[in-house]
Design a protein with these regions (language model features):
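Short, surface-exposed loop/turn segments at beta-strand-coil junctions that are enriched for proline
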Residues: 92-98, 196-202
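C-terminal, surface-exposed recognition/capping segments
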Residues: 252, 329-491
Length: 491
């Protein structure tokens, strides 16, 4: 349990709106003759402003003599009302010295069999950020110990209504990134993101996908949550060709290639052209085993990706939306697009679309945003060893510069990672297993299209002749490929 014992810390902490985050946990006591007592809280989360008093309902069956067993330090004494079946609790007032930032509130009673039964609520002092007025398919969150809200009754365009009955974490990395996910009374998704395990002053970083389901269990929509210690509105952008561009990939947790961990965290997520659903990056920075990073569900169990070939059934926008864990592989009959029929040119465009994967106020970059970029790193007279493990170039337009990662792609045929320098116009795009995962090329989807293919920004590292490494600009690629994305401001 983390405590605030310094008055100055408390003073700064309480300047913002405060919340009480409560996770409900019920415990059942049973006797040999089958009699049992049950006790549980109604909600998984309850939010308070500083000093505010609220009540939370509980349910009790065959339970008597309820008492408070524990509460966090300096929280108001909870009051149990057995008639209304509520517990009233007060969050600490601002600047309360010695108040615990988090802890456990527990009520205990006796079942009719005489055995103890209890229910516990984890409580935490936090602030809230309501993003309901910023509809998008992804939400960038960057504050630690914070409860976030977004509209879960409308799709990412903010207008298409959804009959959302419940929410569920489809995948997350790391495990337990998203806590206390609920659908509140106003139809908002409510979730909590805590602090970094090694640095309490920073947000716990990672990515997650939250799904909205109807009463029959059908997946209606999904939203990407990008938790990162990054604020594009606070010197987190670079200006190229009149476009204000994020200085890192969508879903990236860093923008550095100083270490292998930095490289891996800077790759970000991968997208099939026109899809809003992200795919996780590789498990290792050097693509050594060609496999994905491990994903988890809300129970901490491992979640697996699948691959389906495009067909009349699978190659549709609806199927893609309903199967966010499925990489839809291109086939010859679909011209290696994940879409089977018409090659939709409206999924992504220069104007932000309903399928755009970028956060509110941002959109997928067009090819024009990358025009004229060249490698800023010195290439003459240097050894390949100097760049072999860097997996990225610093690119410049002559005035501004930004690091772009050589993150390769998920290849269109099977979704496997491929990161190798090879002329993208040649017939040698498809390599055998032994040729996979060699350093390294950079590929970024743009919104530009040509017939059944789309344009990707492309650069490479030539490990045999470093001086021949270069940016080749936009190159057409099959749309079933999975590639990183850079977002530009949609002002």
């Amino acid at each position: 349990m983390r405590k605030l014992v310094n008055a100055n810390i408390m003073k700064g902490f309480f300047r913002s709106t405060l919340l009480l985050v409560a996770a409900a946990l019920s415990v059942v006591s049973c006797s040999k003759d089958g009699e049992r007592g049950r006790l549980s809280f109604e909600k998984s989360a309850l939010f308070f402003m500083a000093g505010e008093t609220k009540s939370v309902k509980f349910s009790a069956s065959d339970v008597r003599s309820l008492t408070i067993s524990s509460k966090p330090a300096e929280w108001g004494d909870p009051v149990i009302n057995t008639e209304t079946k509520t517990v009233r609790i007060t969050a600490p007032a601002p600047n309360t010295e010695g108040a615990a930032e988090s802890g456990t509130l527990t009520i205990t009673g006796r079942g009719d069999n005489g055995r103890s039964v209890s229910a516990s609520i984890y409580v935490s002092i936090s602030r809230t950020v309501d993003m309901s007025d910023r509809p998008a398919n992804s939400y960038l969150v960057n504050s630690r110990q914070t409860n976030y809200l977004f509209d879960a009754m409308h799709a990412g365009d903010g207008t298409t209504a959804l009959e959302t009955a419940r929410l569920q974490i489809i995948w997350q990395r790391p495990s337990n990134l998203i806590e206390y996910l609920t659908l509140d009374e106003e139809g908002r998704a409510s979730f909590f993101v805590g602090a970094d395990d090694d640095d309490e002053g920073r947000i716990k970083q990672g990515n997650a996908l939250i799904g909205a389901y109807d009463t029959k269990g059908n997946l209606l929509w999904s939203w990407h949550v990008w938790a990162a210690d990054y604020d594009p509105d606070n010197r987190g952008t670079v200006s190229f060709n009149g476009y204000e561009m994020m200085d890192r990939n969508l879903g990236a947790l860093a923008d550095s290639n100083a270490s292998s961990d930095d490289v891996l965290n800077s790759f970000g997520l991968y997208y099939q052209w026109g899809r809003k659903e992200p795919f996780i990056g590789p498990g290792t920075y050097d693509f050594s085993n060609g496999t994905s990073a491990t994903l988890y569900d809300d129970e901490g169990d491992v979640v697996s990706l699948s691959v389906e070939e495009s067909s009349a059934e699978t190659g549709t926008v609806d199927y893609a939306r309903e199967h966010p864990l499925t990489f839809i592989a291109g086939v010859e009959a679909s011209e290696y697009d994940w879409m089977w029929g018409s090659h939709s040119e409206a999924l992504w465009s220069d104007a932000k679309t309903a399928n755009d994967p970028c956060p509110y106020g941002w959109k997928v970059a067009p090819a024009a945003a990358f025009a004229g970029l060249t490698i800023a790193d010195p290439l003459e007279g240097v050894s390949a060893d100097e760049y072999f493990d860097k997996y990225g170039w610093t690119l410049t337009d002559g005035s501004a510069e930004s690091l772009f990662m050589g993150a390769g792609r998920r290849i269109y045929l099977d979704g496997r990672f491929q990161n190798i320098y090879v002329n993208p116009d040649s017939e040698r795009q498809v390599r055998n297993v032994a040729m996979y995962d060699q350093p390294w090329v950079g590929l970024y989807w743009t919104t530009d299209i040509s017939s059944s293919q789309s344009s990707a920004f492309y650069f490479f590292f030539n490990k045999l002749h470093v001086e021949n490494s270069r940016v080749e600009g936009p190159v057409l690629h099959y749309r079933a490929n999975g590639m990183p994305v850079r977002c530009v401001a949609d002002r």
